[in-house]
């Protein structure tokens, strides 16, 4: 089957945003997973930054992967995908000028959309790992992203962590990003539907929600009614692949089955505890 053009896939994603439905993403992390997701009927996929870090570096989600490494993985997926893919571009790999470079490279890679977040990344000395950059800086990044885009069909999505802010500050951020001209808002840290309603009320553009499977946010019809068009429940397919690989290799070595789950395996083999210790020792990063 022929692979659609990058522009066609971007228009497909635009159609999702313009619809009245809510779509759940497939976690795609390599060309094979992208093909499987399309064959199973998923309408949209996402290449997560955390998943790319695990897949490319076997490292945790500490903003360690470089733009070039992330773009290489996105390009591999882009060569074969038959569904639009959102790239989780983290903080844009630096300041507003770095964001412009990120947009250029990911557009060439063929992604249909990308998110730029306002988290203070990489983690800074003495800060919490969840701290956000100043609002003015965040707006500058979004404006830079829009300026760097060549194909207007590629969607630029502003991402912020509503769980780290009070409602007033969160609304101020999303409204500022909407005013900057982004195509959608991605919210992380939404607690429940009451919280979502307060954040969505002043917005006129579509929403993307990262829920990590939050049971308080499972009603797809209600999500759609509030303007949520894309939901990321997590990256279960990738973690299932880790678990399947581990169990298969243990069996080949005639080692008894393990009780470790996929999350525990990812923690062990990404050496997450070491990275956390280094961040505390060398950077005084707060959890």
UniProtKB/Swiss-Prot annotation:
Keywords: Decarboxylase, Lyase, Magnesium, Metal-binding. Mg(2+) binds at residue 88. Substrate binds at residues 50, 159, 235. Binds 1 Mg(2+) ion per subunit. Its EC number is 4.1.1.112. Transmembrane segments: none annotated. The keyword Secreted does not apply. It catalyses: oxaloacetate + H(+) = pyruvate + CO2. Its cofactor is Mg(2+). HAMAP family: OadC. Belongs to the isocitrate lyase/PEP mutase superfamily. Oxaloacetate decarboxylase family. This is Oxaloacetate decarboxylase. It comes from Chromohalobacter salexigens (strain ATCC BAA-138 / DSM 3043 / CIP 106854 / NCIMB 13768 / 1H11).
């Amino acid at each position: 089957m022929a692979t659609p053009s990058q522009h066609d896939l971007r228009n497909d994603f635009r159609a999702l945003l313009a619809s009245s439905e809510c779509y759940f993403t497939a976690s795609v992390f390599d060309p094979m997973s992208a093909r499987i997701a399309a064959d199973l009927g998923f309408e949209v996929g996402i290449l997560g930054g955390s998943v790319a870090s695990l897949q490319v570096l076997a490292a945790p989600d500490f903003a360690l992967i470089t733009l070039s490494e992330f773009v290489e993985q996105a390009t591999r997926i882009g060569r074969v995908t038959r569904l639009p893919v959102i790239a989780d571009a983290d903080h844009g790999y630096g300041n507003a000028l770095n964001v412009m470079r990120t947009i250029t490279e990911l557009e060439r890679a063929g992604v249909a959309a990308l998110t730029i977040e306002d988290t203070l990344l990489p983690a800074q000395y003495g800060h919490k790992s969840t701290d956000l950059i100043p609002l003015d800086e965040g707006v500058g990044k979004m404006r830079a992203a829009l300026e760097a885009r060549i194909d207007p069909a590629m969607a630029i999505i502003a991402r912020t962590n509503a769980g780290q802010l009070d409602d007033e500050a969160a609304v101020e951020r999303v409204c500022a990003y909407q005013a900057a001209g982004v195509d959608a808002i991605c919210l992380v840290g939404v607690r429940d539907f009451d919280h979502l309603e307060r954040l969505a009320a002043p917005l006129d553009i579509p929403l993307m929600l990262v829920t990590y499977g939050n049971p308080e946010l499972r009603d797809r019809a209600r999500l759609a009614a509030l303007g949520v068009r894309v939901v990321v429940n997590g990256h279960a397919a990738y973690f299932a692949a880790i678990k399947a690989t581990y169990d298969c290799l243990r069996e080949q070595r005639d080692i008894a089955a393990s009780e470790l789950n996929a999350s525990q395996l990812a923690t062990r083999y990404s050496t997450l505890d070491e990275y956390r210790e280094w961040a505390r020792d060398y950077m005084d990063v707060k959890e």
